[in-house]
């Protein structure tokens, strides 16, 4: 839970995602409904004009103690990705798989899907 909260604090402050991805990269489905995205170990490149998103109701299921876990939570707020449309009520369900590498939890998979009454991101690619 703390890794997720820390990642969102970084996102909101720096207006870009923290590089918390596995050394093997990750696969993601984004809330825009597009195709699967391959994320390189260097992380997601997008930046935001503004972003204020927070995780809520985080639940973690341990798959292998100290090695792998799945987190499920909601992500809510607003954002304006650079070169994309504003999302005034971003509200998604999130499922993420984490692996422990060099003592740190790293993202291996993510699936973001909009919740009824909210919207997903307007981004459809990694540009």
Predicted regions and their residues:
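A short acidic/glycine-rich loop-to-helix N-cap element
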Residues: 82-88, 117-123
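Short, low-complexity N-terminal intrinsically disordered segments enriched in polar/charged residues
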Residues: 1-20, 119-127
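Glycine-rich beta-strand-turn "strand-cap" elements at beta-sheet edges
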Residues: 56-64, 112-116, 125
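Extracytoplasmic/secreted envelope proteins and their assembly/folding machinery
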Residues: 4-8, 39-42, 95
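Short beta-strand edge/turn micro-motifs at domain boundaries
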Residues: 91-120
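Short solvent-exposed beta->alpha transition segments
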Residues: 18-54
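Short, well-ordered beta-strand segments in beta-rich or mixed alpha/beta enzyme
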Residues: 18-31, 68-79, 97
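Surface-exposed, charged secondary-structure patches
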Residues: 40-86
